[in-house]
Amino acid sequence: MPSNQEARLFLAVLVLAQVLPILVDSAAEKGFKQAFWQPLCQVSEELDDQPKGALFTLQAAASKIQKMRDAALRASIYAEINHGTNRAKAAVIVANHYAMKADSGLEALKQTLSSQEVTATATASYLKGRIDEYLNLLLQTKESGTSGCMMDTSGTNTVTKAGGTIGGVPCKLQLSPIQPKRPAATYLGKAGYVGLTRQADAANNFHDNDAECRLASGHNTNGLGKSGQLSAAVTMAAGYVTVANSQTAVTVQALDALQEASGAAHQPWIDAWKAKKALTGAETAEFRNETAGIAGKTGVTKLVEEALLKKKDSEASEIQTELKKYFSGHENEQWTAIEKLISEQPVAQNLVGDNQPTKLGELEGNAKLTTILAYYRMETAGKFEVLTQKHKPAESQQQAAETEGSCNKKDQNECKSPCKWHNDAENKKCTLDKEEAKKVADETAKDGKTGNTNTTGSSNSFVISKTPLWLAVLLF
């Protein structure tokens, strides 16, 4: 007969045998409350906005480049209208600056910005697809209105999808039509993802206590296993959720403080985060107006050195002195003053149409401004042709008057037809070329017999008479 001690031990073993099957995680195999799935919906919705944000950013960049091109064209038009003045030279400097800024912006758009936005869109769309598929499985896995994988806030009832919401929470589970929209960063920040559950569920924080959900366990008791538990844990939602192959609650990956890595179980989350934080947008220096002094603006110093000073590596003081000739200073205020003159410059009414604005600052669009610029360039070309034709007789007469003696006095730069330079000569290197002198004399005689020349320039015809040269100059 067993002793009292043995009887008590036997009774304890019987009780333990009855209790052990219950001593599993009370959250295992149970449905998920709204506290768990709502943040996933919020991330999904924000990822859905990434293609819209990309379109918004790319269009903004293109618009800024177009504005720079328009500014360059307006300045060029102003220079043509005011041809021959220092204001025109200032406008050429302005035009060159904006043309170079436009090129810089276009290069940034092609080489950097477009690649960034496409990468961010691709990684965000992929991650969204993985999240949406998981949420869709949770939504559909239910036994009744009170037992399933996706439960309401209290865990009392399963939730349903209506339009673009689940249980009243915005959660479309699909991509929206792509329309430009300013990008947001509410749930996907610089450090990681904001608001997602990030700890094991030890106290039924996001698992319900009685709603069954086979997607929450890898065990064969009310889980994904059949005759036995799964061979290993299963990851879901692109590595965010890990379903154990035992009767324990799911665990989730902490995503609020990510590190750059490769090959991680939650790699899609890392890739989308990396791509998003790498975005520079259309606010970088290539797309912004410059507030530096005139010499510090893109392209200005190089143009002044090469076109005006004709001297590379010029001193800063030399460049500033040269700029003062055209801007009355070298600070940003003088630049702004020229831009104001350009903006207020009127153009011919026939170029823009009746009852349309005629000030340059009110005109935009590459096609319109290019046409206006072509008009004024043709007009300038016509005026220049008039002067060229007027100058020919005087030039011919000067050439015809050259003698051996006058040629002998010229240096190499002055020695021009009908004079001829002889490098090997010892003394008189510039001499009169008799054959060339005869040709000049014949041409001069021919010009003297011709009354006038009819030349067409721009849209106007100019009748060239043998009038004094000073009259032609008045055309400017």
Curated annotation (Swiss-Prot):
InterPro entries: Trypano_VSG_A_N_dom (IPR001812), VSG_C_dom_sf (IPR027446). It is a lipid-anchor; GPI-anchor. One of its GO terms (biological process) is symbiont-mediated evasion of host immune response. Its main location: membrane. A lipid is attached at residue 459 (GPI-anchor amidated serine). It holds the Pfam family Trypan_glycop. Coiled coil: none annotated. This is Variant surface glycoprotein MITAT 1.2. It comes from Trypanosoma brucei brucei.
